[in-house]
C-alpha cells in the first residue's frame, strides 16, 4: 500500500467480502453490516441492470436496517458496463460513503472488477481488507446452485423469473449478443436450441418436466464452472491474505 501522511488508523476501512457465486457473500456482508451499522456496496457489474433483477440475484437483496448500494441503475438498453468504468464507479461510491463512515463493506465476485480494483490498490485512499469465502465440497456446491436455479426459474417474490427476463430481452435482436453472454441465460439458450424451444416466448409456453429439469441442472453446472474459476483467480489475486485485528470491528482478513 502506498505511503500516506495520514496515520493508517485514521484512514477509512473498506472490508471486501469476495468469493465464488452462490457461497453466501451477501449473507456474510449483511450479517457484518447489521453488527457494525456500516453501509454495503455491491461490486457486481450484472447487478447494475434493473431489468435482470432475478438473473443477477439483485431481487430480494434488500434487508431492513441494512443500507445496500449498487454501482448504478442501468438497463440492458444501456449496454455492458466495462470493468474499468465499473471500478471507477466503485471507488467513487466507496470514497463518498467512507467520508461519513469509518467502515464500508464491499461484497462481490466479479473477476474483472476485483482484478481492476487490486491493480489500483496503491492509489486507494482507504485501507482495504479482504475476506475470501471458500468453496464447499463439489456435490454440496452443485446442490446449492441447483436449488438457487430452481428459485430463479420460479416467478414470485424475487421477480418475474429468469425465463421472463431472457424472453423479454430476446424479443429485441439488439440485446441478444449481450444476453447470450450472461451466466444462466447461456444455459437456457443451449436447451432452447436442443429442444426446439422459442426463446422469445420461453416464459409463456409449457415446458416438459424433463426439459425444465435439464435447464435447471445446466444453469447450476454453468454457475459451478464459473465458481471454480472465481475461486482459482481470487486465490491468485488475494494471495497472502492473513488475519488482522481491527479495533472495534473484530478479526477481519487482510491483503497486504
Where is each model-derived feature located?
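Catalytic cores of large soluble enzymes that bind and process phosphate-bearing ligands
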Residues: 21, 82, 211, 215
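Structural motif
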Residues: 19-20, 107-111, 135-136
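Extended, non-globular alpha-helical segments
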Residues: 1-9, 70-75
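Hydrophobic/aromatic beta-strand patches that form the interior of the parallel beta-sheet core
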Residues: 15-17, 41, 69-71, 129-134
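C-terminal accessory "lid"/substrate-recognition subdomains
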Residues: 2-6, 98, 113-256
Amino acid at each position: 500500500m502506498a505511503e500516506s501522511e495520514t496515520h493508517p488508523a485514521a484512514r477509512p476501512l473498506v472490508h471486501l467480502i469476495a468469493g465464488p457465486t452462490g457461497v453466501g457473500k451477501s449473507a456474510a456482508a449483511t450479517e457484518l453490516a447489521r453488527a457494525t451499522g456500516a453501509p454495503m456496496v455491491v461490486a457486481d457489474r450484472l447487478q447494475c441492470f434493473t431489468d435482470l433483477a432475478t438473473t443477477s440475484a439483485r431481487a430480494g437483496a434488500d434487508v431492513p436496517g441494512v443500507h445496500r448500494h449498487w454501482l448504478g441503475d442501468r438497463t440492458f438498453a444501456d449496454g455492458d458496463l466495462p470493468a474499468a468504468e465499473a471500478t471507477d464507479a466503485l471507488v467513487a461510491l466507496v470514497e463518498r460513503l467512507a467520508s461519513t463512515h469509518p467502515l464500508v463493506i464491499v461484497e462481490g465476485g466479479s473477476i474483472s472488477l476485483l482484478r481492476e480494483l487490486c491493480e489500483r490498490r496503491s492509489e486507494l485512499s482507504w485501507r482495504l481488507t479482504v475476506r475470501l469465502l471458500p468453496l464447499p465440497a463439489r456435490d454440496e456446491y452443485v446442490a446449492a446452485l441447483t436449488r438457487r436455479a430452481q428459485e430463479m426459474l420460479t416467478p414470485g417474490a424475487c421477480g418475474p423469473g429468469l425465463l421472463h427476463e431472457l424472453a423479454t430481452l430476446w424479443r429485441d435482436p439488439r440485446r441478444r449478443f449481450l444476453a447470450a453472454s450472461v451466466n444462466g441465460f447461456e444455459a437456457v439458450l443451449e436447451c432452447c436450441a436442443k429442444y426446439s424451444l422459442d426463446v422469445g416466448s420461453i416464459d409463456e409456453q409449457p415446458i416438459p418436466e424433463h426439459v425444465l429439469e435439464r435447464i435447471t441442472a445446466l444453469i447450476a453446472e454453468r454457475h459451478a464452472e464459473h465458481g471454480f474459476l472465481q475461486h482459482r483467480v481470487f486465490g491468485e489475486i488475494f494471495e497472502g491474505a492473513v488475519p488482522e485485528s481491527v479495533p472495534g470491528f473484530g478479526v477481519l482478513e487482510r491483503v497486504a
